[in-house]
Swiss-Prot record:
Keywords on record: Calcium channel impairing toxin, Disulfide bond, Ion channel impairing toxin, Neurotoxin, Potassium channel impairing toxin, Secreted, Signal, Toxin
Post-translational modification: Contains 8 disulfide bonds.
Domain of life: Eukaryota
Organism: Varanus acanthurus (Ridge-tailed monitor)
Tissue: Expressed by the venom gland.
InterPro entries for the chain: Allrgn_V5/Tpx1_CS (IPR018244), CAP_dom (IPR014044), CAP_sf (IPR035940), CRISP-related (IPR001283), SCP_CRISP (IPR034117), V5_allergen-like (IPR002413)
Pfam families for this protein: CAP
Similarity comment: family membership: Belongs to the CRISP family.
Native organism taxonomy: Eukaryota, Metazoa, Chordata, Craniata, Vertebrata
UniProt-recorded name of the protein: Cysteine-rich venom protein VAR4
Cellular-component GO terms for this entry: extracellular region
Length: 170
């Protein structure tokens, strides 16, 4: 019995440390202002840590129109290709887009951090540090001219990575 309790305790701790707390889809919906704040705060916190520091980094803010566009992208459940430019042009501006997919629900902060962690393969003024590495998610998060964003999540039950998070940056 003691081993079972120890196992359950360790499992709970490990799940929390990996961004897989007991979440469900409702806990991650971006119609919730607390979730919007989590997303914006995480982006702005990470943007402040860019090295070298950006001289003119704009502060991100939530935009409901962009969030609706991200929702349309998430509803497509097309995890293999990004939304066509025509589907993410808002007010004449082509918005960037990031996807995060997982088999289990993850916090928004977990997904955003995973995009930002691509910085390990990026050198300012040069680009990717070696061929074949992914850095586009990182550059979307820290693009200095982006200042409005919106995100959405969808459950795609027919996909192996069924939790589909989308953020768009304008």
């Amino acid at each position: 019995m003691i081993l079972l309790k120890l196992y359950l305790t360790l499992a709970a701790i490990l799940c929390q440390s990996r961004g897989t707390t007991s979440l469900d889809l409702d806990d991650l919906m971006t119609t919730n202002p607390e979730i919007q704040n989590e997303i914006i705060n995480k982006h702005n916190d990470l943007r402040r840590t860019v090295d070298p520091p950006a001289k003119n980094m704009l502060k991100m803010s939530w935009d409901n129109i962009i969030a609706e566009s991200a929702k349309r992208a998430a509803l497509r459940c097309n995890q293999n290709e990004h939304t066509p430019v025509s589907g993410r042009t808002i007010g004449g501006v082509v918005c960037g887009e990031n996807y995060f997919m997982s088999s289990n629900p993850r916090t928004w902060s977990f997904g955003i951090q995973s995009w930002f962690d691509e910085r390990n393969y990026f050198k300012f003024g040069f680009g990717p540090t070696r061929a074949g590495v992914m850095v586009g998610h990182y550059t979307q998060v820290v693009w200095y001219k982006s200042y409005k964003m919106g995100c959405a999540i969808n459950l795609c039950p027919n996909e192996p990575l069924k939790y589909f998070l989308v953020c768009q940056y304008c």
